[in-house]
Each structure stands twice: as structure tokens, then as C-alpha cells.
């Protein structure tokens, strides 16, 4: 499922990335303005963004259903524990992909989601401040928050997820498909 969606997703990101502005000099206002431009003035912009939005929902559902299938058939057992852990990491990064993309329009919903996310990060014992700074460019919401999410969503997460998918598929290829237990 992930691989068949990959090239179309790359194309959609390139088109959306040409017109999206995460903000400049700590001001997130251009993010909302550029999203408004994509949705209202760019030819087929509404369709491209909607396809990107809905395929994201499909991706999260597909990964979740795949994890359920692996769990209920017992395919995570010996000798496939490492592949299960990679799959759990892929599920986490898929959800974080959706979350980081959810913040990019920087409307009132995105601001609320960022507030919840930064409060959750700050409440993590011992490493909360570091986690908040790494994810949101500070321990409070600032103009750099949307820029950080854009950077994670467009540059870091695709590399991490693609690497994990390749490792996941390589292990499946090396060990073979698990028989249900």
C-alpha cells in the first residue's frame, strides 16, 4: 500500500510545495495566506490538496489495519520481532506525518493542535523541554513552529519513513512471509 502511493504523493508534495510558504522571520501568517491561495486561486489547487488530505487518511487507516492483521495473526513472533518494531516505528511516524501536515495550514484548528502537542511534549518527564524544542522550535508556540513542522513534514519524515519501509521490506524479503499462528 505504501509503495503504490509513493510517486503520486511525491508529485502532490512538489506541486503544493511550490506555492506553500511556511512563514518568514517568525511570522506564520504567510502559511495561512499561501494555503488560502492554493485552495482558491491556484488551478486545481483545491483538488490536489484534497487528494493529499484524503490519501493521508487512507494511509493511516491502511497502516493501522496492517498492524492489526500482523498482531492478530501472530506474525510478530520469533524471528520477526525486529520487523514488528520497525512496523511500530512506521505507525508512529505515519501518525506524526499526519500531525505535522495538519499544522501546516496554520488556522485555528492547527493552532489548537499545536498547543496540545507542545503541552504534551512539555509534560514528558526529564526530556520534555528538549522534545518540545526539537519538534516545535521552542517550549512555547512561536512563529518558528510552523516552519519547523514544514521542515519535518517535507524533508526529514520522508527520508526516515522511506528508509524504514525499505528496511521493513528487506526483512520481509529475507525472512519470507509469516504463516498465521
Describe every region a protein language model picked out:
Residues 1-11:
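Single conserved hydrophobic/aromatic residue that forms the stacking wall/gate
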Residues 4-5, 71-92, 108-116, 147-152:
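Membrane-interfacial loop-to-helix junctions in multi-pass inner-membrane proteins
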Residues 9-17, 54-67, 87-99, 157-166:
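Hydrophobic alpha-helical transmembrane segments of multi-pass integral membrane proteins
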Residues 17-51, 102-151:
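Membrane-interface interhelical loops and short amphipathic "cap" helices
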Residues 18-31, 64-82, 102-111, 137, ...:
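Membrane-interfacial helix termini and the short, flexible loops that connect transmembrane helices
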Residues 40, 53, 73-77, 98-99, ...:
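An acidic- and aromatic-residue-enriched active-site/binding cleft used to recognize and process polar
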Residues 147-148, 152-181:
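Long, contiguous internal "core" modules enriched in hydrophobic/ aromatic residues
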Amino acid at each position: 500500500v505504501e509503495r503504490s502511493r509513493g510517486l503520486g504523493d511525491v508529485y502532490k508534495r512538489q506541486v503544493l510545495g511550490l506555492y506553500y510558504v511556511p512563514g518568514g522571520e517568525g511570522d506564520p501568517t504567510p502559511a495561512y495566506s499561501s494555503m488560502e491561495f492554493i485552495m482558491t486561486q491556484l488551478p486545481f489547487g483545491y483538488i490536489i490538496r484534497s487528494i493529499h488530505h484524503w490519501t493521508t487518511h487512507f494511509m493511516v487507516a491502511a497502516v493501522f489495519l496492517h498492524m492489526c492483521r500482523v498482531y492478530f495473526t501472530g506474525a510478530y513472533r520469533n524471528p520477526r520481532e525486529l520487523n514488528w518494531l520497525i512496523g511500530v516505528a512506521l505507525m508512529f511516524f505515519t501518525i506524526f506525518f499526519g500531525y505535522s501536515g495538519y499544522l501546516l495550514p496554520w488556522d485555528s484548528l492547527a493552532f489548537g493542535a499545536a498547543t496540545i502537542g507542545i503541552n504534551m511534549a512539555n509534560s514528558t518527564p526529564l526530556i520534555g523541554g528538549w522534545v518540545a524544542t526539537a519538534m516545535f522550535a521552542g517550549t512555547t508556540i512561536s512563529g518558528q513552529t510552523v516552519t519547523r513542522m514544514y521542515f519535518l513534514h517535507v524533508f526529514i519524515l520522508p527520508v526516515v519513513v522511506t528508509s524504514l519501509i525499505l528496511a521493513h521490506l528487506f526483512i520481509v524479503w529475507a525472512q519470507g512471509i509469516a504463516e498465521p499462528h
